[in-house]
């Protein structure tokens, strides 16, 4: 649903429509978008959608997979039959409850979250562009995650490359 590097919101509805035309299931990784923008699986028309609790200030190591009714999946690990036979392992009940609580808080706060996150982003972006005239913002100018800011500096590509090499990235 959203790119975690540059923050661009992807056109999920349109992409899902295209896959439906060709009889292909559509999965969206909505981990970055959860709690920041509305995610309505019916409006998005996705077949599968992934979420992660830690992006909602919930416990790490807990996630969710939405599966549209009628979508048939096959397990890749066999065993105890948890998760309706799709995953074998003991469920992390405490983590699941924590995820549920975090999701509830995120849902309650969603309406004001975008403006809360965008105000400092815009101040920072303006300050950077004013102070560092060779800077530029990555990603779409308006279709982007609330609070997300990713920028670069013209003419500094070699310096960045050297830094990444020095950091062994």
Named regions from a protein language model:
Residues 1-169:
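Pyridoxal 5′-phosphate
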């Amino acid at each position: 649903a959203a790119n975690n590097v540059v923050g661009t919101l992807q056109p999920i509805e349109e992409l899902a429509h295209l896959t439906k035309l060709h009889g292909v299931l559509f999965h969206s990784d909505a981990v970055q978008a959860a709690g920041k923008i509305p995610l309505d699986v019916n409006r998005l028309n996705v077949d599968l959608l992934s979420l992660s609790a830690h992006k909602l200030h919930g416990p790490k190591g807990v996630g969710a997979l939405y599966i549209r009714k009628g979508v048939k999946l096959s397990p890749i690990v066999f065993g105890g039959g948890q998760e309706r036979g799709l995953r074998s392992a003991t469920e992390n009940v405490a983590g699941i409850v924590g995820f549920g609580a975090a999701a509830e808080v995120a849902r309650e706060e969603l309406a004001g979250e975008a403006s809360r996150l965008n105000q400092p982003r815009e101040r920072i972006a303006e300050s950077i562009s004013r102070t560092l005239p060779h800077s530029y913002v990555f990603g779409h100018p308006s279709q982007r995650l609330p609070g997300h800011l990713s920028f670069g500096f013209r003419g500094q590509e070699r310096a960045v490359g050297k830094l990444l090499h020095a950091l062994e990235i």
